[in-house]
Amino acid sequence: LYCILCRFSSRFFYYLCKFPWEPHRYKEGYRERKVLVRMKQYNVGVIGATGMVGQRFITLLENHPWFNLVALAASARSAGKTYEEAVGSRWLMKTPMPESVKKMVVLDAANVEEVAAKVDFVFCAVNMKKDEIKALEEAYAKAECPVVSNNSAHRFTPDVPMVVPEINADHIDIIPAQRKRLGTKRGFVAVKSNCSLQSYVPALHPLRKYGISDVLVCTYQAISGAGKTFETFPDILDNVIPYIGGEEEKSEQ
């Protein structure tokens, strides 16, 4: 998960947010030099901040040069509490909870306008039914708050770009069509691929020019990408699930 989100929070945002260090040329005598000029940081929020993936977002965003974490949102039962109170003993990361978020008051993710007013865009990692996730993410987009989603709900929405930046960065060109559908000027939803695809597609893509048309792929998954442990998922203790139905078709699509 750490490797997945590290790629997600570096390369993916390069294409979606514009790299915040932009090259500028200036002439010094007869020589032309290229320098890096520091651009603004983006104020960002995490929706689903108390869950495992939300916690990982928080650790990755700590002291980040591009992003300033200013809003944490979760379910109504966490809203109004400090982040430290809301998470309690459920902090699952190996590193300590960042001091910068401990006293931040958690917002209700359903209060879209309140969250959207504080940020340039949000990262979304909520644990809800897919139709509820779709509705929530589009609500943020319609509030003119771009959504970068770790969820799978919009991966097959035709006008939502699913980006593996080394392969299909140009897919963000579909965003104007999505904005037209949603009636937005700035808001949109963009998603990452599933963890399996983003691990092997970058390696396979360059081989296409050599005529390779079919590949047999076997993946070996961790216990859970959602934070389940042996205690909360006893079926996996001393066990292996040899086949997970629907995964092949999902990846082929």
Report the location of each language-model feature.
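Cysteine-centered motifs
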Residues: 3-6, 17
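N-terminal Rossmann-like NAD(P) cofactor-binding subdomain of oxidoreductases
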Residues: 33-248
